[in-house]
């Protein structure tokens, strides 16, 4: 999995157009002559315009020229014709000049995949079966809205190893709001009613994000916040003075200063200006004073168990020494100043918001706490500290080479805690944390079925610790543990930390390759041993550096180049030792010059040890992420077993849009 690597048809079209204009006339003339000659030899080509074909040749990866949902036969013909042109031009000064001009245009436009000095991946894509793959919106398990909900890492990994579309929790929550069951939810309604009845403070946290499909909605959704406030203030008539909100600023899955700005994105959708939106929402209930704390997500949602970040988040709510601002007015002035000084939302330090003469709110013993963010990985540390789950925190931090002191954690809080989702099973079973929407593992997950079709074998998961849950909980189909104790080997490399200057996720530009080399070394060693029939790996840098665009463009380019070198090595060794390779991505990110994920397609490439695989015929030349597991099953020779499983669950509709199918013809 190349985390966060998609491609933008719109931006590629602009690069193609401008680069064509910038080509020296002798180069474009030679390319047109070659294109005309190829068309004469390929009478089946749909478009007979030599310039159309010549301009396609400007884009390094041929499949990225295809429109979304291209008719299968037309796409095949277009790719074959383009392949003939590039073969005729290969090794000539023409293509060298084309590459130079195209890269210069990509540098001007900050289009990382072409701006990077990286030709290995393009060559791998063009030499093997490569197909556009849907990775957002409905095809990522979200609501079918326009514009689509951006793809993200957790759902992408869930889809990649599922045999059918894996529905996501945000859709389930939204459906419960629409049918009214949200307001009768046993755990949510219960914790609110207990707090109101006992006149105890009701504290809650929410990431300011997710108004529409493309401005977040990765960890939170605005309609979930609206519904919760309705539950609190309309259904249960809570006193706003006893409701305390921690508002987390995003700037990663939404524009980096969107707490204060309200940009219109490429889809014409307005998002951002979240602080103003929040003030208006709270004002409906006379509850502006309920905003108690502000903090950036890099401290409030640290998933790599960096103690200084988790401590700052905890102490800001429980009574540590925290900066203060006076009301929404003071908050807006402070954020404007911080943005002017170069801070992005994710790096905003913790602040308590004071209202009138009241002192800063503090979480105290016996209070209630609700977490309104639905994605598990970035809520675990927060909820574990509030629940006093030292064993869990020690285990997770030690696995990343970190040793916590815990001197700042209180032992007397005994909070009544409810999460919107189930963040970790141990939080419920050992520490009494409730989940409004309990976790339901995906039934049709390839890895959970692995022991049934390969009982004597093991598969290998490899990644680094910032993506530990992706190479674990998410890729297993929302399972904390493998199906059996001996079917899985997992190797997680600790991500860079404080010693390398990486205090939080905003610092990864300092080592943009991240742990790509170490992961590659482990993959090479594993393939050389020929021990595992199936190996799954995550290369994280393209996503992690994509989140730092446009500020750290050069570092993003370096991250891409590191992945390009790694893939060349991985593919070479895989072929040497008889492995097939499937290269795909969980979602788009680094191809757009913004901090957030994209709704763009990704590419899936399937490589055989020898020769070239053929695309399995389908209506359109377009895959879905949940086609990958069927492709792997076909390569492993267990397709029949997977079909029997689907039939046994009553879901044998193999032609349906929500059931996957192999990308390749039988191997």
Task: Annotate each PLM feature.
Residues 1-14, 29-33, 38, 47, ...:
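Feature captures the catalytic ectodomains and active-site-proximal regions of enzymes
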Residues 75, 79-85:
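Amphipathic, non-membrane alpha-helical rod segments
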């Amino acid at each position: 999995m190349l985390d966060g690597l998609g491609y933008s048809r719109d931006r590629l079209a602009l690069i193609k157009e401008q680069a064509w204009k910038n080509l020296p006339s002798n180069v474009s003339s030679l390319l047109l002559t070659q294109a005309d000659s190829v068309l004469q030899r390929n009478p089946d080509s749909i478009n007979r315009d030599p310039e159309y074909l010549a301009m396609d040749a400007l884009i390094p990866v041929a499949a990225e020229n295809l429109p979304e949902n291209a008719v299968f036969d037309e796409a095949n013909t277009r790719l074959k014709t383009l392949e003939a042109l590039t073969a005729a031009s290969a090794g000539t000064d023409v293509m060298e000049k084309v590459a130079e001009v195209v890269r210069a245009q990509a540098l001007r436009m900050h289009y990382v995949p072409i701006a990077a000095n990286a030709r290995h991946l393009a060559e791998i894509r063009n030499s093997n079966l490569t197909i556009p793959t849907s990775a957002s919106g409905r095809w990522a398990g979200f609501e079918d809205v326009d514009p689509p909900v951006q793809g993200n890492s957790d759902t992408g990994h869930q889809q990649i190893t599922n045999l059918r579309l894996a529905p996501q929790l945000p859709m389930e929550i939204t459906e419960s709001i629409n049918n009214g069951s949200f307001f009768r939810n046993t755990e949510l309604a219960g914790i609110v009613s207990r707090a109101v009845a006992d006149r105890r403070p009701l504290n809650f946290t929410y990431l300011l994000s997710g108004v529409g499909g493309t401005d977040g909605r990765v960890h939170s959704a605005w309609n979930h916040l609206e519904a919760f406030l309705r539950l609190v203030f309309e259904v249960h008539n809570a006193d706003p003075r006893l409701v305390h909100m921690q508002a987390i600023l995003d700037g990663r899955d939404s524009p980096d200063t969107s707490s204060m700005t309200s940009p219109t994105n490429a889809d014409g959708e307005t998002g951002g200006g979240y602080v103003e939106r929040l003030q208006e929402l709270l004002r409906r209930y006379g509850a502006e004073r309920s905003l108690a704390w502000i903090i950036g997500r890099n401290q409030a949602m640290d998933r790599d168990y960096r103690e200084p970040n988790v401590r700052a988040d905890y102490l800001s709510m429980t009574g540590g020494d925290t900066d203060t601002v006076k009301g929404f007015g003071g908050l807006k002035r402070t954020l404007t100043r911080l943005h002017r000084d170069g801070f992005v939302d994710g790096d905003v330090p913790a602040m308590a918001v004071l209202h009138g003469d009241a002192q800063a709110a503090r979480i105290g013993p016996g209070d209630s706490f609700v977490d309104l963010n639905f994605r598990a990985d970035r809520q675990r540390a927060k909820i574990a500290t509030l629940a006093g789950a030292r064993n869990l925190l020690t285990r997770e931090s030690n696995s990343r080479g970190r040793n916590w002191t815990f001197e700042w954690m209180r032992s007397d809080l005994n909070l009544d805690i409810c999460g919107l989702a189930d963040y970790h099973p141990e939080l419920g079973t050992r520490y009494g944390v409730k989940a409004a929407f309990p976790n339901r593992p995906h039934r049709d997950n390839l890895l959970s079925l692995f022991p049934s079709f390969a009982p004597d074998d093991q598969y290998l998961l490899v990644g680094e610790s910032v993506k530990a849950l992706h190479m674990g909980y998410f890729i297993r189909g929302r399972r904390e543990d493998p199906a059996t104790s001996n079917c899985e080997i997992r190797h997680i490399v600790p991500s860079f930390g404080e010693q390398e200057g990486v205090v939080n996720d905003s610092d990864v530009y300092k080592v943009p390759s991240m742990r790509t080399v170490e992961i590659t070394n482990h993959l090479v060693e594993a393939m050389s041993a020929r021990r595992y029939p199936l190996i799954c790996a995550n290369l994280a840098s393209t996503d992690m550096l994509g989140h730092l665009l446009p500020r750290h463009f050069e570092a993003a380019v370096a991250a891409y180049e590191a992945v390009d070198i790694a893939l060349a090595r991985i593919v070479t060794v895989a072929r040497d030792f008889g492995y097939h390779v499937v290269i795909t991505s969980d979602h788009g990110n680094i191809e757009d010059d913004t901090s957030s994920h994209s709704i763009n397609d990704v590419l899936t490439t399937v490589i055989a040890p020898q020769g070239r695989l053929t695309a399995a015929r389908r209506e359109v030349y377009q895959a879905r992420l949940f086609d990958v597991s069927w492709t792997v099953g076909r390569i492993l020779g267990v397709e029949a077993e997977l079909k029997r499983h689907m039939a046994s669950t009553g879901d044998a509709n193999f032609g349906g849009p929500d059931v996957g199918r192999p990308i390749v013809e039988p191997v």
